From Swiss-Prot:
InterPro entries: MbnB/TglH/ChrH, Xyl_isomerase-like_sf. Signal peptide: none annotated. SUPFAM superfamilies: Xylose isomerase-like. This is UPF0276 protein Caul_0757. It comes from the Bacteria. It comes from Caulobacter sp. (strain K31). Pfam families: MbnB_TglH_ChrH. Belongs to the UPF0276 family. PANTHER family: UPF0276 PROTEIN HI_1600.
Length: 276
């Protein structure tokens, strides 16, 4: 079956998601929102899973932290994955915990060789517990850090080589980082090996409300035309990949998100584009 486009599943859209008859539609959820023994969220997810494929996109394992992944979190993730059998599981190349304290954000780190060893070890631990390979997502960056030993693309490629993991390419993150740090998004994307790319994310960004020239990865706006253009260029090079429309803030009506999803779906399946 050819790769298709999906939506990030939001609780206000459960009923419409369940009722939708869109061709090839799948949904992605943050597993942290479903790590419970029961309740209405899990019941909705079970009903939707009976009709649709799912993927799990984690935000809490802190793969770049200077400690092993939380074993309780990993165990809960495995329980959820075993229950819902997602076609993919992914996490971010970032850290959010330090010495037991949790930060409410996905934070960058110097890409040193020691960090490469640490992240690779944490990915291997995650994959061993889950019994499957995972995808790792590129971050969005705002300010340059010092102390790097490797470019970000080289760091990601080496992670795939060492651990067998794949890449989740967030095209909006690439655009935002390239704009903020002054490099070419096209060059970054061209450096990623096609065979490693397992999924693509598309999302919106906006200006810094503080008045700086920075772009912020808000997940709270429509996908920019510049990001759509990068996406088209990427799939022309690597071929179709499962593609997710992400919206986590200022969430519009289901049909508004479905319009973006249908656009991506048409780009993945040119024969469908003429019917949109």
């Amino acid at each position: 079956m050819s790769p298709t486009a999906g939506l990030g599943l939001k609780s206000q859209h459960y009923a419409e998601a369940l009722a939708s008859d869109a061709e090839g539609l799948w949904f992605e959820v943050h597993p942290e929102n479903y790590m419970a023994a029961g309740g209405p969220r899990l019941r909705w997810l079970e009903a939707i899973r009976e009709k649709r494929s799912l993927s799990l996109h984690g935000v809490g394992l802190s793969l770049a932290a200077d400690a092993d992944p939380d074993p309780d979190h990993l165990a809960a993730l495995k329980t959820l994955a075993d229950r819902f059998e997602p076609f993919g599981v992914s996490e971010h190349l970032a850290w959010s915990t330090h010495r037991g304290a949790h930060q409410p954000d996905l934070l960058p780190f110097p890409r040193t060789r020691a960090a490469l060893d640490r992240v690779a070890r944490n990915i291997e631990r995650m994959q061993d517990v889950l019994g499957r390979t995972i995808l790792v997502e590129n971050p969005s960056l705002y300010l340059p850090l010092t102390g790097h030993d490797l470019d970000e693309t080289d760091f990601l490629i080496e992670l795939t080589r060492r651990t067998g993991c794949g890449l989740l390419v967030d095209v909006n993150n690439v655009f935002v980082s390239a704009s903020n740090l002054g490099y070419a998004a096209e060059t970054y994307l061209d450096a990623l090996p096609a065979e490693a790319i397992g999924e693509i994310h598309l999302a919106g960004h906006g200006p810094d409300e503080g008045g700086s020239a920075l772009l912020i990865d808000t997940h709270g706006a429509p996908i920019a035309e510049s990001v759509w253009a990068l996406y088209q260029r990427l799939i022309e090079r690597v071929g179709p990949r499962p593609t997710l429309i992400e919206r986590d803030d200022d969430i519009p009506a289901f049909d508004v998100l479905m319009a973006e999803r249908d656009r991506a779906h048409g780009m993945l399946t040119p024969s469908a584009a003429s019917r949109l």
